[in-house]
Amino acid sequence: MRPLLAAALMLIVAGCASTGPETASYAPQSGAESDAQTRARIHTELAAGYLELGNYGVALQEAAEALKSEPNYAPALSVLGLVYMELRDDKTAEANFQRALRISPLDSDANHNYGTFLCQRKREQESIKYFLAALRNPLYATPDKSWVNAGICARQTGDLTAADEYFQKALKLRPTQPQALFEMADMAYKRKNYSEAKAYIERMQPDVTQTAGMLWLALRVERGLGNRNAEASLGFQLRRSFPDSREARALMAGQYE
């Protein structure tokens, strides 16, 4: 799953929790959740789960059920936007994101997810505006993810200064933010600053799930440093764990760049 979408899904599920700031506008003043809101929240969580599994038909059904219970439930509209984004129905996706923001313009999830859509559709400058809007909420539970996505989108435009700034802000909030560390390591590698790249890689928590991309970057960093034993060890891990990956194929072909 693409990093931007994965982050968006994590935010949606977290945002549907009754204590999350993203759903505050839907809760009664007493803080209690009505039966309709409870049903909408549960169906939205199910929709997000099915979306993550790639079961788009059921995700659409669950989101529709959520909106039957609570027609103006912004988290459900955000999930609908993400589903239609995956289905490449961009017009419907954008309509759902925009409707969510009309209902709840300060909703951090809605801003973040619309930013995700815009960035994936190569509308990076627009997307960054929405990631920054998500960060205006002082109660936002996962601001590091919006800083990371803003950095990824800035990097896609070639604005490495802004990307560096956004990744550093993510790391200030969460020093072990794995995607920010990976991006900073990759940027350092591209500058041929292998020592700096390795320092970022070593900051990743040991329990972070390794990906083919992480192993491939670490391998090339060790190669740049001339550490042949470490390079060979990482190559073995890459071939064993991800034998069919693009990175493993590049390794076998000796294509390091």
Question: Where do the PLM segments sit?
Answer:
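Bacterial Sec signal peptide processing site at the extreme N-terminus
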Residues: 14-35
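Structural marker of alpha-solenoid helical repeat scaffolds
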Residues: 35, 69, 103-104, 137-139, ...
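Residue-level recognition of tetratricopeptide repeat
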Residues: 39, 73, 107, 141-143, ...
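Canonical tetratricopeptide repeat
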Residues: 45, 79, 113, 147-149, ...
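Register position in tetratricopeptide repeats
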Residues: 52, 86-87, 120-121, 156-157, ...
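TPR alpha-solenoid repeat register
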Residues: 76, 110, 144-146, 180, ...
